[in-house]
């Protein structure tokens, strides 16, 4: 039998280097040069000099971790969370909140220059968030620590699968302030709860939910004990077995209201909603203002979810067609249209990664295109849609790289980037949300 030689991977030498940081990338990492390659440096800011250790050395770039700041930026601040240096949830607490937005905007501009060949962007004022307690949903991990011989409830460590035990998360909604200690105590006191793999948190306007995912059956007696502790915190419990379905029909449907827009959105606990409630409302108002619909437009809203944009725009448009690949979200969008007495919006379930030429909504007489894709972007639909039929395209992005890439396609189809603005949906993280408005030349 022939043996195939496989070279042993050499361990990386722990080099300590002095690096001069010249810029920040779109993940919130400092950028330096080392050995004629770009080096991405965590916990480093532009115009700083740091001592760092190389943690990955690739063919075209390297990665490093700062362990000492030799010359600090004027915008460097002390992190406000006790877990910041271990937890992987936030990446930018060491940077002043206002400057975070500035650096993110610079990073997006560079991506547009690189991928879309656009070097002058008409930046609008960013949509800002409060600095703390902005998350209305989160996912917590639960894992057994062999060394400590106990279960931990917390977040994943930065760059690791291990769990950081958390006392309190200052970016999480205050209604869940005690969730870590309450469940840490419960799970460690009752061995039957060691089958809990994670907790999902979701805050509605009137109810706060904790979904408990478990891999083995849990007795009703234990469930009652957990329910009692949850009731003291005003949390609604939902138990989820290995099945992916989150069954909560026995509880009132969660919802969020957009009072300024006069809308109410119900959602299932397995549906996607925006994490930051205040920025979501500001984002929808901005979309309404930027599009400035006059009442005779036909709007196509792709990746529409539960109707977040569709129903807002339906109030000003002639018709809105929403398309979404998740059936439960389409059902909620249809229900939300009915709840809000909106009759000019219809919703279709369709996998937008597939060919769309046979879809019932394809090639309609449409004026406005709204895109709100996942991080993979909208390239699949942009390459298939007859874009020239649209007068306006509104693109809402959660990944600036795919936005810049897709903007090149939109520009080549005869559109001009009219406006662009950041939405600081996730302060203190490397995540960048952007809204861009394109108009046909």
UniProtKB/Swiss-Prot annotation:
Keyword terms: 4Fe-4S, Iron, Iron-sulfur, Metal-binding, Methyltransferase, rRNA processing, S-adenosyl-L-methionine, Transferase
Enzyme class: transferase
Binding site for [4Fe-4S] cluster: 81, 87, 90, 169
Stored InterPro entries: 23S_rRNA_MeTrfase_RlmD, MeTrfase_TrmA_AS, MeTrfase_TrmA_CS, NA-bd_OB-fold, SAM-dependent_MTases_sf, TRAM_dom, U5_MeTrfase_fam
GO molecular function, one term: iron ion binding
Membrane-spanning ranges: none
Keyword Lyase: no
Catalytic site positions: 398 (nucleophile)
Biological process per Gene Ontology, one example term: rRNA base methylation
Pfam families, A to Z: TRAM, tRNA_U5-meth_tr
Domain TRAM: residue ranges: 10-68
Record family assignment: Belongs to the class I-like SAM-binding methyltransferase superfamily. RNA M5U methyltransferase family. RlmD subfamily.
Function: Catalyzes the formation of 5-methyl-uridine at position 1939 (m5U1939) in 23S rRNA.
Protein known as: 23S rRNA (uracil(1939)-C(5))-methyltransferase RlmD
Lineage of source species: Bacteria, Pseudomonadati, Pseudomonadota, Gammaproteobacteria, Alteromonadales
Gene: rlmD
């Amino acid at each position: 039998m022939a043996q195939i030689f496989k070279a042993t991977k050499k361990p990386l030498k722990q080099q300590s280097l002095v690096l001069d940081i010249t810029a920040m990338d779109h993940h919130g990492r400092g950028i330096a040069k080392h050995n004629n390659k770009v080096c991405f440096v965590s916990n480093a800011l532009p115009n700083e000099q740091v001592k760092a250790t190389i943690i990955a050395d690739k063919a075209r770039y390297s990665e490093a971790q700062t362990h000492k700041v030799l010359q600090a930026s004027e915008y460097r601040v002390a992190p406000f969370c006790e877990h910041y240096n271990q937890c992987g949830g936030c990446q930018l607490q060491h940077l002043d909140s206002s400057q975070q937005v500035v650096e993110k905007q610079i990073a997006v501009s560079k991506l547009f220059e690189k991928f879309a060949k656009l070097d002058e962007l008409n930046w609008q004022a960013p949509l800002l968030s409060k600095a703390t307690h902005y998350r209305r949903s989160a996912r917590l991990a639960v894992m057994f620590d062999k060394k400590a011989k106990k279960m931990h409830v917390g977040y994943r460590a930065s760059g690791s699968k291990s769990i950081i035990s958390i006392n309190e998360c200052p970016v999480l909604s205050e209604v869940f302030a005690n969730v870590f200690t309450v469940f840490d105590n419960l799970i460690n006191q009752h061995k039957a709860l060691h089958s809990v793999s994670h907790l999902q948190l979701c805050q509605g306007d009137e109810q706060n939910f904790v979904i408990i995912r478990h891999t083995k059956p849990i007795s009703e007696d234990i469930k009652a004990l957990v329910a009692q502790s949850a009731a003291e915190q005003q949390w609604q419990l939902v138990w989820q077995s290995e099945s992916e379905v989150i069954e909560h029909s026995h509880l009132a449907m969660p919802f969020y209201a957009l009072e300024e827009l006069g809308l109410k959105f119900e959602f299932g606990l397995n549906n996607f909603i925006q994490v930051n409630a205040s920025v979501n409302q500001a984002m929808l108002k901005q979309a309404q203002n930027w599009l400035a619909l006059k009442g005779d437009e036909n709007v196509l809203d792709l990746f529409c979810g539960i109707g977040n944009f569709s129903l807002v725009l339906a109030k000003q448009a002639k018709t809105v067609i929403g398309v979404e690949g998740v059936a439960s979200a389409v059902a909620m969008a249809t229900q939300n249209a009915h709840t809000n007495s909106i009759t000019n919006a219809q919703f279709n379930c369709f996998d937008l990664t597939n060919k769309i030429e046979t879809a019932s909504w394809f090639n309609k007489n449409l004026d406005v295109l709204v895109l709100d894709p996942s991080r993979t972007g909208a390239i699949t639909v942009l390459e298939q849609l007859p874009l020239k039929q649209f007068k306006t395209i509104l693109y809402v992005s959660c990944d600036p790289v795919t936005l810049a890439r897709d903007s090149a396609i939109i520009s080549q189809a005869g559109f001009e980037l009219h406006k662009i603005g950041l939405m600081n949906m996730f302060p203190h993280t490397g995540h960048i949300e952007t809204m861009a408005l394109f108009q046909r030349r």
